[in-house]
Amino acid sequence: MTKSELIERIVTQQGLLSSKDVELAIKTMLEQMAQALATGERIEIRGFGSFSLHYRAPRVGRNPKTGQSVSLDGKFVPHFKPGKELRDRVNDD
């Protein structure tokens, strides 16, 4: 599902909200989440999951075109850990 598909689903389910209002709310929420992660904060949405940063250590990678070894710097990457309710819902038979 893309962001625009999510907006359309919410607009369809919630008849009182305009497409512009839903789009603004989602863009604002995602921007706030990105800013929080950029400053090292952890985001927890109970019942859904948590977002945090994991450190990826420096390593040697390969250029897929040439096969040449390339040194990759260490960096932080966003990580999502699903909550129990989300895991149960996804795995519900």
Swiss-Prot record:
- Gene3D superfamilies in the cross-refs: IHF-like DNA-binding proteins (4.10.520.10)
Q: GO cellular-component terms in the record? A: chromosome; cytosol
Q: Which CDD domains match?
A: IHF_B (cd13836)
Q: Does the keyword Endoplasmic reticulum apply?
A: no
Q: Which UniProt keywords apply?
A: DNA recombination, DNA-binding, Transcription, Transcription regulation, Translation regulation
Instruction: Quote the InterPro entries the UniProt record gives.
Output: Hist_DNA-bd, Histone-like_DNA-bd_CS, IHF-like_DNA-bd_dom_sf, IHF_beta
Q: Which HAMAP family is this protein grouped with?
A: IHF_beta
NCBIfam families, from UniProt?
A: hip (TIGR00988), PRK00199.1 (NF001222)
* Protein name as catalogued: Integration host factor subunit beta
* Organism lineage: Bacteria, Pseudomonadati, Pseudomonadota, Gammaproteobacteria, Pseudomonadales
Q: Which gene encodes it?
A: ihfB
